[in-house]
């Protein structure tokens, strides 16, 4: 199975929380492949700055466990449409979440997250 791990999932994994155990267990199955959308790296860097964490160490962990998905112009355009549609249902649905959802639909994979915006969406493993 292919999974997109979002920023929230990575952070829970890094702090070793109970929620993060879900991602850790998925890493153990060699059949699973993991992706990280590059815009999530900016969110993780922001978290590192706020929490005084070593981003260089964490990005090495991310890169050793997942492939980084580059974003191109048309991805942003598609994400803007996805954000518009999601905002009809969730008023605070953001552009980064829309980008992750856009890539999930494009690649027909699953998202791993504990972000409330993904809770009731299909193809999401929600980390409770």
Regions found by a protein language model. Give the residues of each.
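Active-site neighborhoods of divalent-metal-dependent phosphate/nucleic-acid chemistry enzymes
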Residues: 69-112
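Short loop->beta-strand "edge-of-pocket" segments that line small-molecule binding or catalytic clefts
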Residues: 33-35, 64-70, 110
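Short, well-structured N-terminal submotif of metal-dependent ribonuclease cores
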Residues: 1-36, 47-60
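Histidine- and aromatic-rich ligand-binding microenvironments
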Residues: 5-6, 36-37, 93-94, 115-116
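Acidic, PIN/NYN-like endoribonuclease modules and their adjacent C-terminal/linker elements
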Residues: 26, 101-128
